[in-house]
Design a protein with these regions (language model features):
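Short histidine-centered beta-strand/loop micro-motifs
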Residues: 34-41, 83-85, 105-107, 157
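Hydrophobic aliphatic residues
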Residues: 26-28, 119, 172
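Generic protein-terminus/edge-of-domain signal
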Residues: 1-67, 71, 77-78, 112, ...
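Short acidic, gly/pro-rich beta-turn/loop elements at beta-sheet edges
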Residues: 34, 57, 104-105, 180
Length: 185
């Protein structure tokens, strides 16, 4: 298996639907050709939570080694890839969602004040989450809960997933170091 992309490496997979623009998936590196997924990008935000093993993860030229319990935020339009380390498999949860799921409608205060500053900051292509740091551990717990909800699908699970994504976004916004260097400048 490999990610389907266009000529510019944009992933062609739909991440959810218009009505619920969220895709939550259980992934395993060994399912990909040569234990890696190719460089690609998409306009959606991606959150990855490592369940077991390790993954070599690259985002816009930065390389990370994520181990069991770690996670990463990959910003919209960021070029990213992942691979096995020393031939060992990695199992992870990928939550990919459209930014509008956070803010609702264009030009809302939530979009302009809290979402766009993160999305457009060139230095915020990625943020690694470690269980050793309190606020990041809270983010990781939210990521795991999102996956659990996607499996059990109790009444109103979609709203609970939205609530959890907003909780994650609040933590990212509060703790991000903004460079002021926008993609739009």
């Amino acid at each position: 298996m490999q990610i389907r992309m266009d000529k510019e490496n944009r992933e062609l997979k739909a991440h959810g639907s218009y009505e619920f623009p969220v895709n939550i998936s259980y992934e395993q590196l060994s399912r990909y050709e040569r234990g890696s997924f190719s460089w690609h990008w998409h306009p959606e935000i991606e959150l990855t939570f490592v369940l077991s093993g390790q993954i070599g993860y690259q985002v816009n030229g930065k390389s990370y080694v994520l181990k069991e319990g770690d996670g990463i935020f990959c910003n919209t339009n960021a070029l990213h890839s992942g691979h096995m380390i020393d031939g060992m498999d990695c199992v992870y949860i990928s939550t990919t969602f459209a930014p509008r799921f956070l803010y609702g409608f264009s030009n809302s205060m939530i979009q302009t004040r809290y979402v766009e500053p993160v999305l457009t900051d060139m230095q915020l292509a990625s943020i690694v989450f470690s269980p050793e740091i309190d606020w990041q551990n809270q983010v990781l717990a939210c990521m795991h809960r999102i996956y659990d909800l996607s499996l059990s699908q109790p009444s109103a699970f979609e709203m609970e997933i939205q609530e959890l994504l907003l909780s994650i976004w609040i933590e990212i916004y509060r703790h991000a170091s903004f460079s002021g260097e926008s993609q739009n400048t």
